[in-house]
Amino acid sequence: MKNTGKRIDLIANRKPQXQRVLYELRDRLKRNQFILNXTNPDIVISIGGDGMLLSAFHKYENQLDKVRFIGLHTGHLGFYTDYRDFELDKLVTNLQLDTGARVSYPVLNVKVFLENGEVKIFRALNEASIRRSDRTMVADIVINGVPFERFRGDGLTVSTPTGSTAYNKSLGGAVLHPTIEALQLTEIASLNNRVYRTLGSSIIVPKKDKIELIPTRNDYHTISVDNSVYSFRNIERIEYQIDHHKIHFVATPSHTSFWNRVKDAFIGEVDE
């Protein structure tokens, strides 16, 4: 029995190829009695690349328990995409057979406490990074209320398991499987000499642990959350934890395993 009637939102970038796929997929979904709904969807399909999936995530980050995501790539296979632009019929068929099954990944919760009492709350699917605007950043790192180290360097990034393959990996961090619900704190160009020392390697903390960053100066710091950038002054502290909510993807026969994604992105075919 065909499973139609689901509410679906399509989100695409403005590139001509993505717009062409958007038009074609919209037509196929309508012909198969799916409902296009941009307000209260059951499924969100991003068309483009991983950056577009991040945008879709942030559009619906306050409805994570109600929606599932599908990534449709118009270029090379990405970490969050299961379909290519020439697989529209396959995608529609799998949607018709969808049972509601899902694959879930952890999300990062970030709280920025300002000295005036304001609290800014963000969610990140990949990572959140902090840098000082114009000079060396100095910040105390506290884990579960216990002082760990004083960091000096360009900045720090905290990543999710799925985000461990992004900026974190380029900094020399470890790649974590998303079933490991943990956060990874990675240094950005730390200052290490006879006077100043840091651990010099990534720190991986389990689900229930909390990482706090306490800047020692009250000037401007730049905080990036996935593909968005913010500037704050007079930061009292920043708290990082695994969020209570997860992102859910539609589980289909086309869902690519995590290690296959890693292999495709960084290794490719291995010669025997």
From Swiss-Prot:
Q: Does the keyword Cell membrane apply?
A: no
Kindly indicate whether the keyword NAD belongs to this entry. Answer: yes
Give the required cofactors. a divalent metal cation
Q: Which reaction does it catalyse?
A: NAD(+) + ATP = ADP + NADP(+) + H(+)
Task: Give the CC-aspect GO terms.
Answer: cytoplasm
GO process annotations (BP): NAD metabolic process; NADP biosynthetic process
Q: Under which EC number(s) is this enzyme classified? A: 2.7.1.23
Gene Ontology terms, MF aspect = ATP binding; metal ion binding; NAD binding; NAD+ kinase activity
Active site residues according to the UniProt entry: 50 (proton acceptor)
Cellular localization per UniProt? Cytoplasm
Q: Where does NAD(+) bind?
A: 50-51, 126-127, 152, 154, 165-170, 189
Summary of the function given for this chain in its UniProt record = Involved in the regulation of the intracellular balance of NAD and NADP, and is a key enzyme in the biosynthesis of NADP. Catalyzes specifically the phosphorylation on 2'-hydroxyl of the adenosine moiety of NAD to yield NADP.
PANTHER family reported for this sequence? NAD KINASE
Q: What is this protein called?
A: NAD kinase
Q: Which organism is it from?
A: Streptococcus pneumoniae serotype 19F (strain G54)
